[in-house]
A protein has these predicted regions:
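A contiguous strand-loop segment
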Residues: 1-93, 121, 126, 311-315, ...
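C-terminus-biased signal that marks the final domain/tail of proteins
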Residues: 1-13, 127-128, 135-136, 144-147, ...
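Beta-strand residues in well-ordered beta-sheet regions across diverse protein folds
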Residues: 15, 76-78, 151-152, 285-287
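Short, surface-exposed beta-strand-loop junctions and turns on beta-sheet-rich folds
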Residues: 20-22, 81-83, 156-159, 166, ...
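Broad, structure-driven detector of short, well-ordered beta-strand segments within folded domains
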Residues: 28, 68, 149-153, 275
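Proteins synthesized as precursors that undergo proteolytic processing into mature forms
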Residues: 92-128, 240-248
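Aromatic- and glycine-enriched pocket-lining scaffold segments that form the walls
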Residues: 112, 116-152
Length: 327
């Protein structure tokens, strides 16, 4: 499964974990302004905003998992199995396949008002990319530096929710996830005072007891609550190093270790990668399961007026910076 989050210091940060039992060979992909997107039902788009994100490239087409555009909008698709239902292609509407939803939004939206206007006339359909790539059951988080929304296509239509916590995981649906945060209304980063009974002499015996009851398992509902609490209470300096470090700490609160989430005999879900995008500056940072050294790709270091995507395979081998000894 997966977890996505937003965070703001001086700049705006957006990212996610990809938690799964295997990789599709995803890469960091920069799509320049003049790459020709061929949308299945909406024709060609030859000019658009530049995009950087994590994608599986199939037939020279970037199938984005998460991405930002040069205007500072971030978007990620996360598993929503059992609840996602896409519409049928309808004449007279802007029919957008789920696999092209991220570039459809990021290629043309510079503000969240533009995102909302686009969604109001969009028909999200289940047209597959290819026979071997059926439509994935997803829902999405879209955000800029000021706000975030969640988009879910379900049996009764397309729903757009304000997302005040800037977090998305998987099931259950977003409205239910938000409601369940009521269960944690008493949690605090501060040490608790005895409100159990004034005549019972109860005292704290450890630091961190204000968050007793915050779930620690790897289910999507628990990850939602844990990252929401961590994100909403996280304190960071404004420098790039401090901000990026803090963002990775926020998503690190739901890091999945091999062996803790068995999905089949001998197969385990792990955090394949964690991303942190500085959406203000167009930089894509990431770590992988075996490489916790933060790697970075800057979209503005490439020719953004080009026609061909630039791909950077993830550096997955662990790296150690020695202070003495072996180099």
């Amino acid at each position: 499964m997966c977890t996505a989050a937003t965070y703001r210091t001086k700049d705006f940060y957006f990212g996610r974990t990809l938690d799964y039992e295997f990789s599709y060979g995803e890469e960091i992909v920069i799509t320049p302004r003049n790459y020709e997107f061929n949308f299945r039902h909406m024709g060609q788009a030859e000019e658009h905003y530049a995009i950087i994100g994590m994608a599986h490239v199939a037939g020279d087409y970037p199938l984005y998992y998460d991405a930002i555009n040069e205007k500072g909008i971030g978007m990620a698709g996360l598993n929503f199995v059992g609840n996602a239902v896409y519409a049928e292609v309808t004449e007279g509407k802007e029919n957008v396949a789920s696999f092209e939803f991220i570039p459809w939004v990021l290629r043309q939206c510079a503000t969240m008002d533009e995102v909302r206007a686009l969604l109001a006339k969009m028909n999200l359909v289940g047209t597959p990319f290819a026979e071997q790539f059926p439509a994935s059951q997803l829902h999405w988080i879209i955000a800029d530096e000021n706000e975030a929304i969640t988009v879910e296509s379900v049996a009764d239509g397309l729903h757009i929710y304000e997302n005040p916590v800037g977090v998305l995981t998987n099931n259950p649906p977003f409205a239910q996830q938000m409601f369940m945060l009521n269960n944690y209304i008493g949690l605090s980063p501060k040490q608790p005072e005895n409100s159990f009974a004034k005549d019972v002499p109860l005292n704290t015996y450890s630091r961190g007891m204000g968050a007793l009851g915050l779930p620690g398992d790897l289910s999507s509902a628990s990850r939602f609550a844990r990252v929401a609490f961590t994100r909403m209470n996280a304190v960071s300096g404004d420098s790039e190093a401090e901000s990026v470090s803090q963002f990775f700490h926020i998503l690190g609160s739901v890091d999945q270790q091999r062996g803790c989430c068995e999905v089949a005999e001998g197969k385990y879900e792990i955090t394949i990668y964690t991303s942190c995008c500085n959406a203000t500056r167009g930089i894509y940072y990431y770590t992988t399961y075996d490489n916790h050294r933060i790697m970075g790709v800057d979209m503005h270091a490439e020719d953004l007026d080009g026609t061909t995507p630039t791909c950077y395979p993830m550096i997955e081998e662990g790296q150690v910076s020695w202070q003495n000894g072996p180099n």
